Regions:
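Bacterial Sec-dependent N-terminal signal peptides
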Residues: 1-29
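Hydrophobic alpha-helical and helix-loop surface patches within well-folded domains
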Residues: 3-7, 25-26, 40, 200, ...
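N-terminal, polar/Ser/Thr-rich
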Residues: 24-66, 77, 93, 137-141, ...
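Glycine/proline-rich low-complexity spacer/linker segments in large multi-domain proteins
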Residues: 35-42, 119-120, 128-172, 216-221, ...
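Hydrophobic helix-coil surface modules that form long, contiguous segments used
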Residues: 66, 159-318, 347-350, 359, ...
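Solvent-exposed beta-hairpin/edge-strand motifs
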Residues: 78-101, 504, 508-513
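A surface-exposed beta-strand-loop module
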Residues: 86-143, 193, 526-536
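Non-catalytic accessory/interaction domains
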Residues: 171-174, 179, 189, 196, ...
């Protein structure tokens, strides 16, 4: 018998559901992908497969029609099922569940399927829809997907969480002259009526953020990575770069693959190894299984490439190859542990180079690659731990940054040193075997490693992984009769409560004609170094001489006169880094003094990586920590010293680094005229090799200075032949205009998302827009730039918020700029804490400049 009262009650509950978005089952519907939702879905859903079809028209403005068949098993069927789809409901056209067409319910970024349409066991969902495009990166004649961390849901309905791995079938319908690449091998392609249908075999088991395809007008190179055939798609047209790079690109991949197979004792775990070079790619690379994507400019280098550029390419390829095991084969359970895949990729990429370059070069490269970048965040009041909490994947992009990419490998190096290399390797191998094709967390790994370690890793883990910051190290050295009678080393936290960072480091005592190195186990707030007692008093002491210790180390002023006599390149690099870090903290040395010290070494430093480090520091000190008045007074002398050092140095790459430094800092008319002649005649100084990209950079630098008309930029544009590079140049040009109104209009245009699509180009343009020589007119953009940050985080890719802030605030030093940041943070006391931290990280040099310039 029908109970009218129950019907009425049911209607009321249904009405409440519609207007509140709350599930009567107790499962709340909220934007993003909450951790609660992810945990529930993982507990009931398994054996997921997606069969997807995208019909991609030749015209970018035309919509992409898509079809999806999704199959999965349910172990329980008591709640409304939520599929993630961050698009308008109007783009969902037809929904069929287990053979039955049902009404479409969609709100708060979720497609909802009521339990009555589902069943325990196997289920099938078919959807006809218009594809979302937020993560499709559509261009005029190519596109590529980029779904990390939670952007698959912007393109098609799915379970967009890393621990619901799935297999994927894919069909792409594209223009006949396009090529396509995906995770699975290409089964076949059929041409008909000017269109091409590409069908791909079922992929390996992947998380949604690793599902990918690339399609468009690309060239294709077939080569081998190890024993496998490998297809490489690219759009580069510069034959010098292609001829100089192609064989090396495949070789670096093959070498990296062999190293990781040997080190992990696990053969390459997937069916194919293809990759694509993308113009103006947002990241360095992305580890999509079977279809890795790279930034084209990092892969393709000509004969003018510096050691830093060559290292960056090798590192990048090794990094993405390492991800095949660390991230793809074993994936983090939740993005709280996204750092795990990145730390292993970076750390293992570094290790893969050690055998070929030798320990000394490896140690130096590791130091200069990771420590300055890690300190750049960890010294700030906005620093974050390596491992962070995350309640919703919509905020997962804020987890990325230099802490996980650079401090985490340093932590891992200390962990390997603590355990020993063999035991560390044994533990990691067990971890990979145990969680193959599955998901794992940091506690899963640390519990395994703990079995192989003598030390208490749980306690060690607490300060290194779960807390932010770095130690500040100081010392006292007591002397008696020319001997060291007592040597005490102290450590304390730079910010926050008292903490101890257990670590090993080396300290070297330098004497006339010789030196003595001491290894220190710094595992307490105060360590008495018994080994030093009775030694002769040295000329000077260098802390962290091997470059493996992490913290703010003392700088012995007695070292200054002997700095360039230190024989080991890694020790000199460590000294340079410590000097710079201490300068920022107002210890031992002032900015102008340090600038002079570094400039004096430009003709003496013999190691290219060190010269690159020094020139970076010179540029930063010059623009950020000297007043405009002091810069103007110093400019002619500085220019002459840099140019003279360039003439003294004999190696082409050393000369090029110094030429680029000269280009960065020049202010005088004489220097401008000299550079203009180099650019106009396209004749580099003797011994310096410049590429088209270098002349483009030179044109940008000259356009910033007064007295250069717009014909310079137009002529440089006419020299560029590659279509993608031309578009990049045209995008950046307004940011360099001498007309303030045109620059205002450019900044205003960035308020529209469509004008921010090429994020790497936006970052380059913002750098020039906010260059110190333009800050008197660009400071007015700062309030709006901060106001836009939340939208930037919501609409952009993972690195864009940091890039937006860094290229905007990176060179400001004025009280006005500092006040804008302070006022913004005061005005928004409940601001997203992770974004607030990024503001503090980026503005740290600004606030330090205010203190140091007083």
């Amino acid at each position: 018998m029908l109970n009218n009262r129950n019907v009425l009650a049911g209607f009321i509950v249904f009405f409440i559901l519609l207007i509140t978005g709350k599930q009567v089952t107790g499962q709340e519907v909220e934007t993003g992908v909450s951790k609660k939702l992810a945990i529930y879905r993982k507990s009931v859903i398994s054996r997921v497969h997606y069969a997807l079809e995208f019909d991609i028209p030749s015209k970018r403005a035309d919509k992409i029609v898509a079809m999806e068949t999704m199959s999965f098993n349910l172990s329980e069927n008591k709640r409304v099922l939520q599929l993630d789809f961050k698009e308008d409901k109007a783009k969902l056209w037809k929904l069929k569940v287990n053979g039955k067409v049902i009404p479409i319910q969609h709100h708060d970024e979720h497609l909802l399927i009521e339990a009555r349409y589902l069943k325990k066991g196997a289920n099938q969902v078919k959807i006809e829809f218009q594809s979302g495009e937020a993560a499709l990166n559509r261009n005029a004649d190519y596109l590529y997907t980029l779904f990390v961390p939670d952007r698959a849901r912007t393109v098609f309905p799915c379970f967009d969480q890393p621990d619901l791995k799935a297999t994927y079938g894919l069909t792409l319908k594209v223009p006949a002259d396009w090529k396509a690449m995906a995770n699975g091998p290409l089964k076949d392609s059929v041409l008909a009526s000017g269109r091409k249908t590409c069908r791909f075999a079922t992929s390996d088991t992947l998380s949604t953020y690793l599902f990918s395809f690339v399609a468009g007008k690309f060239e294709q190179q077939v080569g081998k990575v190890g024993p496998m055939r490998s297809d490489f798609l690219y759009r580069e047209t510069d034959t010098a770069k292609i001829n100089n790079s192609m064989n090396e690109i495949f070789k670096i991949h093959s070498d990296a693959l062999k190293y990781f197979e040997d080190w992990t004792a696990i053969p390459y775990p997937f069916r194919k190894f293809d990759f694509a070079a993308i113009p103006d790619f947002q990241f360095g690379g992305m580890e999509h299984v079977g279809a890795i994507q790279y930034k084209a400019s990092t892969l393709f280098l000509d004969g003018t490439a510096t050691k830093d550029q060559l290292n960056s390419r090798s590192n990048l390829i090794a990094h993405e190859t390492a991800h095949m095991w660390f991230g793809d084969l074993v994936t983090m359970t939740w993005f709280t542990d996204v750092w795990m895949k990145e730390v292993f990729a970076n750390f293992m990429a570094d290790k893969s180079a050690e055998g070929s370059v030798g320990k000394a070069v490896f140690d130096l490269k590791f130091l200069v690659d990771h420590f300055p970048a890690a300190y750049g965040v960890d010294r700030t009041t906005g620093s974050n731990p390596i491992r962070q909490d995350l309640d919703n994947l919509k905020d997962a992009g804020t987890m990325y940054g230099n802490i996980i990419y650079h401090k985490a490998p340093i932590m891992m190096q200390q962990l390997e040193r603590l355990m020993g290399k063999e035991k560390f390797q044994q533990g990691v191998r067990e971890y990979l075997r145990k969680f193959t094709n599955n998901n794992a967390s940091w506690p899963d790994l640390i519990n395994i490693l703990d079995k192989y370690a003598d030390a208490d890793l749980q306690q060690w883990n607490k300060v290194w992984v779960n807390e932010p910051g770095r130690p500040v190290v100081d010392y006292t050295m007591e002397k008696k009769n020319g001997k060291i009678s007592k040597f005490i080393i102290k450590q304390g936290a730079e910010y926050g409560g008292a903490r101890i960072w257990p670590q090993f480091f080396e300290m070297t005592l330098y004497y006339q004609g010789y030196s003595k190195e001491v290894t220190v186990n710094l595992n307490a707030a105060q360590t008495e170094l018994k080994e030093a007692e009775g030694m002769d008093v040295p000329l000077f002491v260098l802390f962290n001489s091997s470059g493996q210790g992490y913290g703010l180390w003392p700088s012995d002023r007695a070292m200054f006169n002997h700095l360039y006599t230190i024989d080991q390149p890694v020790s000199r690099a460590s000294a340079y880094i410590s000097l710079y870090e201490n300068m920022l903290n107002g210890r031992y040395v002032k900015p102008a003094e340090l600038l002079n010290l570094f400039v004096e070494g430009l003709s003496k430093e013999t190691e290219e990586l060190n010269l690159k480090l020094m020139t970076n520091y010179i540029g930063t000190i010059y623009w950020e920590f000297l007043s405009p008045t002091d810069r103007a007074a110093l400019s002619e002398l500085l220019e002459n010293k840099i140019w003279s050092a360039m003439l003294v140095q004999t190696k082409a790459n050393h000369k090029k680094l110094l030429f680029k430094t000269y280009q960065d800092v020049f202010l005088t008319k004489e220097a401008g005229d000299r550079l203009y002649q180099v650019w106009k005649s396209q004749t580099a100084p003797e011994g310096v090799k410049l590429s088209e990209d270098d002349y483009t950079s030179l044109a940008f630098s000259m356009a910033l200075r007064p007295g250069r008309d717009s014909t310079l930029m137009k002529e440089q544009l006419s020299r560029i032949n590659n279509t993608d590079r031309k578009k990049r140049f045209e995008f950046i040009m307004p940011a360099l205009s001498s007309d303030v109104v045109e620059r205002d209009q450019f900044f205003k245009s960035l308020e529209l998302k469509v004008n921010r699509e090429k994020e790497s180009n936006v970052g380059a343009a913002l750098y020039y827009l906010h260059h110190p020589l333009r800050q008197s007119t660009s400071v007015k953009y700062l309030p709006k730039s901060l106001e836009m940050l939340e939208e930037i985080q919501t609409t952009g890719d993972i690195f864009f918020p940091q890039n937006w802030l860094q290229t905007t605030f990176g060179y400001y030093q004025s009280e006005e700029a500092a006040q804008i940041v302070t006022d913004f943070l005061k005005k928004h006391p409940n601001y997203n804490p992770k974004l607030r931290a990024k503001v503090l990280q980026t503005a740290d040099n600004l606030f330090r400049a205010r203190r140091l310039l007083k």
